[in-house]
Amino acid sequence: QLLALRMRMRGIQCYILAPIKGHEFRRACNKIGGEFIKIVPGSPHCINVMEIRHTLSPEMELIDEIDYVEMGSMLARKIQQLMTFFGLLIPDMSNEEEQMLDEALIRTYADFGITHDNDSIYTDMSSAPPKMKQMPILGDLHKHLQENPMTQRLAAIISRFVTGSAQSFNRQTNVDLSNKY
């Protein structure tokens, strides 16, 4: 807690993942204006694992003279993160299943108009900050996996997070992830 508080005082974003006794952090979190998020099945809180988040702030882009268009595809980076996530969830995934999952992810994002063009994640680039498109959720990916006979096993494993006991993960993000603590 002390380390997190020190980081907060320096303006460094800090997350504390406490699966066993997380409730012990609630009071400290609330005292400094933090966001206490309880991620469990049935929780009202949700972080959409499929959400593409713009990682650089406009201020940092100006300071570092980085153009987000030159950073590479945000979609490709997100798909890499999701492949890691699903690799942990399904450790015995075959190479063929990985390829099919990759293709299903690309199709799922395409359904929402999201491509490798970084501008495609925004609905309005003229506003500050730019307004982002609605992102797909696990249920959208699940539909694509169910359609392909070669990804039925993946669909069955993921169904727990779509219609099963952990279906609270099948929603849009409803917490403030930009909060520093």
Annotate each predicted stretch with a short phrase:
Residues Q1-P19, H23:
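P-loop NTPase nucleotide-binding module
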Residues G22, R26-E35, P41-S43, M50-Y181:
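P-loop NTPase motor domains
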